[in-house]
Amino acid sequence: MSSYFVNSFCGRYPNGVDYPLHNYGDHNSSGQCRDSTGMHSGRYACGYNGMDLSTGHSSPGHFLSSGERTQSYKDSPTATPVRYNQPVTASSAEPSSDHLPCSSLANSPVSEQSHRALKISLSSTAGSASKSFGTVLSREGVSKVSSSMEEEKPPGSGQTASQNVSEAPQIYPWMRKLHISHDNLAGPEGKRPRTAYTRYQTLELEKEFHFNRYLTRRRRIEIAHTLCLSERQIKIWFQNRRMKWKKDNKLKSMNMAAAGSGYRP
């Protein structure tokens, strides 16, 4: 990354000769321009001859001229290292080991390795991003397919299944023991509708009751088969008929008693 950072500044800053800086140190030399060739080119990479960024001050007073400033830099013991204060010569113009020019940095094996590592890291990140994007797309495709399959299902299938479940009555054990037919049930309370007997059935039952008020189980089964009725219906009809007969006889006896008490010979 260090070589990449240095190489990015090579084409950004032009040579300092094209951009001279005015000297604002002395009021007598306000119109003069400073010679940029006297700057220390060995301090900068890529042969940059721009502004002198030395920060040594010999006196806290007013600003000094260029000659006095260079003299104070040479005389002061706390100034920067010697190689920054030497005049421009062939030896000083040569770049040091820590400030290499752009060409040497570009051709160095360290820079090539760093560039390769950077390219590998970028390619790996791009590959991982593409893989993750592909997985997201595949998941979205699966979800879309599932949603389309759900939409293609006919809406009446779920309703018919729910209707079949609701229509089938739940049969409990006590209902089976009582032999209750669910077709004859009417209303939430489970009351049976009143049985409507035909004229023929009523006449046959009245005839049988006239001869015998109480039926045996065998005779009750025979009458049920003959009249196409259930054994329970025959039993209930005979019970109701006996209650009616008792009521009629009671009224008849009461009337006869009243008539006998009123009749005096």
Curated annotation (Swiss-Prot):
CDD domains in alphabetical order: homeodomain (cd00086)
Positions in coiled-coil regions: none
GO biological process, one term: anterior/posterior pattern specification
UniProt keyword terms in alphabetical order: Developmental protein, DNA-binding, Homeobox, Nucleus, Transcription, Transcription regulation
Stretches with biased composition (Polar residues): 67-79, 86-95
Gene3D superfamilies xrefs: Homeodomain-like (1.10.10.60)
First-listed, main subcellular location of the protein, grouped into a coarse class: nucleus
UniProt GO cellular component terms: nucleus
Motif interval(s): Antp-type hexapeptide: 171-176
Entry keyword Transcription regulation: yes
Cellular compartment(s): Nucleus
An annotated Gene Ontology molecular function: DNA-binding transcription factor activity, RNA polymerase II-specific
DNA-binding region: 190-249
Superkingdom as given in the UniProt entry: Eukaryota
InterPro entries assigned to the protein according to its UniProt record, in alphabetical order: Antp_homeobox, HD, HD_metazoa, Homeobox_antennapedia, Homeobox_Antennapedia_CS, Homeobox_CS, Homeodomain-like_sf
Cited Pfam families: Homeodomain
Annotated segments matching region Disordered: 59-108, 144-165
Family: Belongs to the Antp homeobox family.
PANTHER family: HOMEOBOX PROTEIN HOX (PTHR45659), HOMEOBOX PROTEIN HOX-A5 (PTHR45659:SF10)
Biological role: Sequence-specific transcription factor which is part of a developmental regulatory system that provides cells with specific positional identities on the anterior-posterior axis.
Name of the protein described by the UniProt record: Homeobox protein Hox-A5a
Organism: Danio rerio
Gene: hoxa5a
